[in-house]
Amino acid sequence: QYDIIWVDWNNGTDYIQKNAYVLEEVIKWINAEKLANGSSQSNVVLGASMGGLIARYALKDMEDRGIPTQTSLYISHDAPHQGANFPIGYQYMSRHALHQYVKSPALLLGGEVIMPLFTDGVTPLDLLLLQNTPAARQMLINYVGINYGITNTAHDTWQNELRIKGYPSMRKIAISNGNHCAITQNASAGASLLSIDGNYSTGWFTDIVLTTFPGVNTGIFKSLA
């Protein structure tokens, strides 16, 4: 008999270290609860995707600081220990979509005011800005910024810290969602994966708003940078 404890984050896209510190507090609480209830059962910590990085960092940080983890097994489920790859072309497409979205008052009105009423408050802008979050910048091997430039400083800094930190000492198991038979996807480097040719405009309404309020786009992009 055992208990399953699921850990969720108020801000799952925050810095990986911050959520690792939260996990440390959870592990300490679990160990205190076990002690209070006379249990000596060791913990098994499983982290999926980015959660695998959070768990690795938390367990090793506790060991480094001499805090007992009471953990016998760490399971890394498809975690990007060497970094995450999101095709640069898709990132550029996402950035272009963001630029077009904020230039369209009609879309902004529908997406940021009306749509959240039916999507638990989530807006298209929230999704288009996921690339900007601290965790995304830390994990992405190549990160395309708001102005289309590639900057990997956050990733390089994080990977160096993670490499120096190393792995916790308990038994470790890694699970990957990749193909176990090493069969490739027949996509060569630089190949075109998606191509779209077309255009769209909100026409006169956008022209009126941008003419009346010429600084609206500048203000939006300053707030996103």
Where are these regions (language model features)?
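Short, surface-exposed "cap/lid" segments of acyl-processing enzymes
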Residues: 1-6
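Short glycine/serine/threonine-enriched helix-capping/active-site loop
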Residues: 7, 77, 175
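Catalytic nucleophile-loop/oxyanion-hole region of alpha/beta-hydrolase
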Residues: 9-25
